[in-house]
Amino acid sequence: MIFKVKDEDEAIRLANDSPFGLGGSVFTQDIERGKRVAAQISTGMVYINHPTAVKADLPFGGIRRSGYGRELIGLGLKEFVNHKLVGVTDIDGAF
């Protein structure tokens, strides 16, 4: 879908006004601006000047109703294990 908006803020609001958040794209000649916009879009993946894509060497996943977590590469493996913090203090140490 393509929407015409009045400014960058409206574009970000429109992009984030969805129960889904798998991926999106930002098209711009100013790469740094594209990175700033991408950081504000609530999706699991954002591509700058490229349509969304899936590759085995990139993490894949979304947020909200598009799912939680990541698949593929090392990040994906971590989604299927439980991490546990084990703190160790000397028996005579301060709490």
Regions found by a protein language model. Give the residues of each.
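Conserved C-terminal structural/oligomerization subdomain of aldehyde/semialdehyde dehydrogenase
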Residues: M1-F95
